[in-house]
């Protein structure tokens, strides 16, 4: 276990709080006008999946568990969960639906993800920062809307809704940020 200050805690970190392991879902630092800066952390207990919210002073020490981050390739999904393979030694790991969370919509066959492994168990999955998806449905362009930088709603091939610039139509491939479902750019290929 390594002691770190609360302000350095990030999404995906594994913390040891009172002898129990938690995966950090979100971590935000708040600096109020008056008072001490604090770090608000939402976590999921690894053993039973219970969600917990903690608030620490940014300078407070918390224990980070030793977790190995390894590259794994996504193979397929079945009733058991999401199957990943380590390309170096061909070991396969199954990640359950709860651990995968909402990220499952972005998984594509052959995609390389970073799995956080603690004592042989997958704790968290980190997707690539950007994925390329196709626009399935979007509103048509309205002439004269080019003066403002307005975005229009669009539905991606994985079913997620996002906002895209007016010049993007259905059938076009775009790059999307996996962290917040936002449009990054039009795909190059």
UniProtKB/Swiss-Prot annotation:
Pathway: Protein biosynthesis; polypeptide chain elongation. Its main location: cytoplasm. Signal peptide: none annotated. InterPro entries: Elong-fact-P_C, NA-bd_OB-fold, Rib_uL2_dom2, Transl_elong_fac_P/YeiP, Transl_elong_KOW-like, Transl_elong_P/YeiP_cen, Transl_elong_P/YeiP_CS, Transl_elongation_fac_P. One of its GO terms (biological process) is peptide biosynthetic process. The keyword Protein biosynthesis applies. Involved in peptide bond synthesis. Stimulates efficient translation and peptide-bond synthesis on native or reconstituted 70S ribosomes in vitro. Probably functions indirectly by altering the affinity of the ribosome for aminoacyl-tRNA, thus increasing their reactivity as acceptors for peptidyl transferase. This is Elongation factor P.
């Amino acid at each position: 276990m390594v002691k770190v200050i609360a302000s350095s805690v990030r999404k995906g970190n594994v913390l040891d709080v009172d002898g129990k392991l938690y995966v950090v879902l979100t971590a935000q630092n708040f600096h109020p006008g008056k008072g001490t800066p604090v770090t608000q952390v939402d976590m999921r207990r690894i053993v039973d999946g219970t969600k917990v919210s903690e608030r620490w002073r940014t300078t407070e020490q918390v224990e980070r568990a030793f977790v190995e981050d390894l590259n794994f390739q996504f193979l397929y999904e079945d009733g058991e969960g999401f199957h990943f393979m380590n390309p170096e030694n061909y070991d396969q790991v199954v990640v359950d639906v709860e651990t995968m969370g909402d990220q499952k919509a972005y998984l594509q066959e052959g995609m390389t993800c970073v799995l956080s492994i603690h004592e042989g168990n997958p704790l968290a999955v980190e997707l690539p920062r950007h994925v390329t998806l196709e626009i399935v449905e979007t509103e048509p362009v309205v002439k004269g809307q080019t003066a403002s930088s307005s975005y229009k709603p669009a539905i991606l091939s994985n079913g997620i809704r996002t906002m895209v610039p007016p010049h993007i139509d259905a059938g076009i491939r775009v790059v999307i940020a996996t962290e917040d479902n936002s449009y990054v750019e039009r795909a190059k290929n």
